[in-house]
Amino acid sequence: MYVSLFIGCAIVLDIYCYTLYGHLHVNVSFDGQWCQLKAYLFYVSGCGFFYSYLLQAIYRLCRITLFRKPSLQTFRLYVCGIVVQWLLSFVQVIPVLLLGTFEYLPHDYHCQIAIHNVRGLLIGLALVHTIPISLTTMCYAYTMFYIQKISATIKTARQLATDQRDFLVLKRIFIVLTTLIASGMPAFSIGLYFQFTGHLPYWSTQFQWLSATFAMLIVSIILIFVSPNVPKFRMYFAQ
């Protein structure tokens, strides 16, 4: 999760540097394979970020619903899961690249899915966001159903308390994903507005990146409180 977040932030910083340089040297162009590759890696990092939450959701699901199978909770298994997570991320974004969805924006000096390209936005949404978010939501829904309908009849009070803690973490993961989805809706709405009116505000791309940056900030803050080690740090510094 943190690796994908770091890669995404590094690419965003690189994009800002290119954009700033382009505004200072208006005749320059950065169109090319490297521009396309950076856009591809940015979406790979985003896909990997969502899959990291799916992996956490699967872990919590196994701890709660499959607690009698410790083999599904081993460290080695989830290391393999991380490898699979990144393989899926690289593979899923390849169609976005091959379909020519990434465009060079001459006024912004970088490549991305243009905000007026609703087809491209839908392809990116389907391949990058929908699959991991849908699976994570299914894990969340089934875990909630299990705790409410089944868990109380077969587990001890101590096990139920552990389940509640795991479910709380899973709930916070769902809140983070909801925040990320909500952050992308304004940009998507601008794309739909362009389809109906043929008018695209000049600040649309900047607004898209502003909403994405704001979402990263919110997620970073939420992650501080989601982390199970935060109470330990508080107790340590309170001493």
Describe the role of every protein-language-model region.
Residues 179-192, 200, 204-239:
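Seventh transmembrane helix
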Residues 10-14, 90-94, 134-138, 169-192, ...:
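Hydrophobic alpha-helical segments of membrane proteins
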Residues 3, 145-185:
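Intracellular effector-coupling site of seven-transmembrane GPCRs
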Residues 46-81:
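Class A GPCR helix-loop hinge within the 7TM core
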Residues 22-44, 78, 90-134:
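Loop architecture of class A 7-transmembrane GPCRs
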